[in-house]
Amino acid sequence: MNATSLLQLMWLASPALPIGGFSYSEGLEAAVDTARVATEEEASEWLLDQLDLSLTRSDLAVLAQSMPAWQCGDTARISQLNAWVLQTRESNELRAQTEQMGRSLLEWLRNHTTATAEQIELLANLQPTYPLAFALAASATQAPLRDCLLAYAFGWAENMVQAAIKSVPLGQSAGQRILQALAAQIPCAVDHALTLPDDARQAFSPMLAILSARHEVQYSRLFRS
């Protein structure tokens, strides 16, 4: 991967990208509120499980399949995968998150010459989800597929660690230890996601869905619903 591709990929994965990823806790704040997560160890275990059981089998698997579809212009496949993401968000909050981040990344793409006008128009007509928007942006970097999945997963990890720091709450050193644990597991998660066919892709995480739904009506919260 050349320097330009690497820097573009780092840009896409950066929490500074104005798409709002830092404003969601994906059920973690509700887990804290219900005393399921109260310590550094519990936060680390929670996020490692979420990486393994949720992100790997859903978003990372979709990303692995949608990047080649963008690169070869397979509009039917792109539409199918985008619809799958929408259908498998099990709470209003989780669906609103992927739609808002997808729209925000679409607007970012409109202002950068990283995708063609035809690709952007196709995405805009799909009620874009974040994984499909990221796949389009990442495919334009010409970075290898595996590296794009690594960047996506690490960007997710950074946002979720910040959510843990604010909601548990934890110190910065504790957050860095959790991030280190997540970073150690991300390569294996990505390699697994790359092997998943359509019938093995899933987003069945009932407790995460329940907590996300509870967070929608939680009395006091830091993160967006």
UniProtKB/Swiss-Prot annotation:
List each coiled-coil range.
none
Q: Does the keyword Nucleotide-binding apply?
A: no
Instruction: Give the transmembrane ranges.
Output: none
Q: Which GO molecular-function terms appear in the entry? A: nickel cation binding
User: Where is the protein localized?
Assistant: Cytoplasm
InterPro entries given in the database record: UreF, UreF_sf
Q: Name a GO CC annotation attached to this entry.
A: cytoplasm
Does the keyword Chaperone belong to this entry? yes
Listed A to Z, the keywords are: Chaperone, Cytoplasm, Nickel insertion
- The protein's predominant localisation is cytoplasm
Share what the entry says about its subunit structure, partners included: UreD, UreF and UreG form a complex that acts as a GTP-hydrolysis-dependent molecular chaperone, activating the urease apoprotein by helping to assemble the nickel containing metallocenter of UreC. The UreE protein probably delivers the nickel.
Q: Which family does it belong to?
A: Belongs to the UreF family.
Q: What does this protein do?
A: Required for maturation of urease via the functional incorporation of the urease nickel metallocenter.
Instruction: Please identify the protein, giving its name as recorded.
Output: Urease accessory protein UreF
User: What gene is it encoded by?
Assistant: ureF
